[in-house]
């Protein structure tokens, strides 16, 4: 898929990884807003620099077990870090571990010791390590010896690597905003974390892209009311090549989204009337303010809609909105029926 205009986000992250590590960076945003694409572009554009990227994309895997976590993050080798052979187009690395290392009896402290060894070796080689984990929250149900939570202990390690020792940048990408909410309210991370939002595309950028792709003024004006995410533009371009009009494509999207939302509500054990009451907050506006517009008793319905990717919660700015503009129109459609 073409890399659409994300120069602001691209430059921010390129500059960020070249500063001294001082905090964990959480890059968050609505699903499909382009977080992973931007991060991979950063890695690609800096592949000839002295930065060594350890990039782990957990969205590629089913929710991993302890053993799978170890095989994802480590490669048996006589080197402390080595190129990931499975990634052909990106120069990214994995942590190295001895050939005879026994994964069956490994303790969490051993895991962290090996990560530290790899990072320190990168630094000794005159290079700068950056650890990137995409969809980090998928590790939240993994426990090691004595019931230790892998994710909680990883956060402690990340604080040590960044804020305390300034050895390595740690960047975590996620679209799970309830996970971000938990992190944001975690007192042990409050002074050691930063947050960066990659949100919907701006209308001016969408207009420019569509013009470059040969859409006429009428089509562009229509699209600007509905588009917000990069993949939507790609689908729209492909559908036009297949003979579908802009109106047909977008109406089809909204119908599919509306049917999906209705099915979700119809099959939920939650109070249907209360869910619709929450959705009605978006009948006349695309976003609401968490502090002003949400009551305590509404939170379980809000959470339900966030968990099912109907709504997006920007915890840092206190805003709740649909995950996309087309989702907003789907919400409005089911409210009108």
Curated annotation (Swiss-Prot):
The lineage of its organism: Archaea, Methanobacteriati, Methanobacteriota, Methanomada group, Methanococci. ATP binds at residues 29-36. This is Uncharacterized ATP-binding protein MJ1076. PANTHER family: AAA+ ATPASE DOMAIN-CONTAINING PROTEIN, YALI0E33429P. It comes from the Archaea. It comes from Methanocaldococcus jannaschii (strain ATCC 43067 / DSM 2661 / JAL-1 / JCM 10045 / NBRC 100440) (Methanococcus jannaschii). It holds the Pfam family MJ1010-like_2nd. Belongs to the archaeal ATPase family. Keywords: ATP-binding, Nucleotide-binding. GO terms for molecular function: ATP binding; ATP hydrolysis activity.
